[in-house]
A protein has these predicted regions:
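Short polar/charged helix/loop
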Residues: 5-156
């Protein structure tokens, strides 16, 4: 995504969760954007409301979160970063584009073996509205449902 603040994090967390659920080994999910901003707090709250354990590791302009999807697995480390951040892989990965703006603006992702657009509407348009929590949950569940289908089709 462009700002690596909402959809890409929801997708990272749900993809890693689905890989674990379907017992697909050697899948490690990351997120990145064309810009680094911050993981939007409503994303962490939405994930927590869906049953994930969320802990803030560091509080600053770009907080770092520990996101547990299973008691027996390492947590996902969530923070906003650019696609080429040292935290992300440099080669042998598939780039899933969750934002149509980034999909159009990034025709080439260095190191990606595959580039797959699965775009979602940005829940940002509901920030600071009475529908915010509902719409973030709706988007999170849409992403979870799509990724459930994707990972159910993979033969481990």
């Amino acid at each position: 995504c462009t700002h690596n603040s909402r959809r890409s994090h929801l997708s990272q967390v749900w993809a890693q969760t689905m890989a674990n659920y379907f017992n697909i080994k050697n899948v490690f999910c990351y997120s990145g954007g064309t810009e680094a901003t911050a993981l939007f707090p409503m994303v962490a709250e939405t994930l927590q409301n869906s049953g994930f354990q969320i802990n803030t590791i560091s509080k600053n302009e770009n907080p770092v979160y520990s996101i547990k999807y299973s008691n027996n697995e390492h947590p996902i480390i969530g923070f906003s970063k650019k696609l080429d951040d040292e935290f992300n892989p440099k080669s042998e990965f598939a780039a899933i584009m969750t934002c149509s703006q980034a999909d159009g603006g990034c025709p080439f992702i260095a190191g990606a073996e595959k580039r797959i657009p699965i775009t979602f509407e940005d829940p940002k348009i509901f920030d600071s509205t009475p529908q915010q929590a509902e719409k973030y949950n709706e988007r999170s569940m849409q992403i979870a449902t799509e990724l459930f289908h994707v990972f159910s089709q993979i033969n481990s």
